[in-house]
Amino acid sequence: MLQLLLAVFIGGGTGSVARWLLSMRFNPLHQAIPLGTLTANLIGAFIIGMGFAWFSRMTNIDPVWKVLITTGFCGGLTTFSTFSAEVVFLLQEGRFGWTLLNVFVNLLGSFAMTALAFWLFSASTAH
């Protein structure tokens, strides 16, 4: 149990630092859409899709790696709370079109990245 807790802790910290770095780098590039949050969510969605595909086929993988990558790293990297706050800020500024675009791209983009990664990894390990 302690190993699992440490894996979540290490993965979560690493994912959170990665999200912060992405926000610092990409959020200033566009005033209306926080590109750092979008990038973090899309990357996290891809990684978790790849992870689930990999873990479903490689059943002998240590559970520590599973929680390090999924619950830890992806949990720290992706963020629904920041996304929600940014949507509210856009609404408060009256940027309704940008709000809808931001919600659409974050949600559908994340679903698409998870499905793409799962499909790519499943196809590559089917042989």
Curated annotation (Swiss-Prot):
It catalyses: fluoride(in) = fluoride(out). GO terms for biological process: cellular detoxification of fluoride. GO terms for molecular function: fluoride channel activity; metal ion binding. Keywords: Cell inner membrane, Cell membrane, Ion channel, Ion transport, Membrane, Metal-binding, Sodium, Transmembrane, Transmembrane helix, Transport. Signal peptide: none annotated. GO terms for cellular component: plasma membrane. It is found in: Cell inner membrane. It is a multi-pass membrane protein. Na(+) is not transported, but it plays an essential structural role and its presence is essential for fluoride channel function. Fluoride-specific ion channel. Important for reducing fluoride concentration in the cell, thus reducing its toxicity. This is Fluoride-specific ion channel FluC. It comes from Escherichia coli O7:K1 (strain IAI39 / ExPEC).
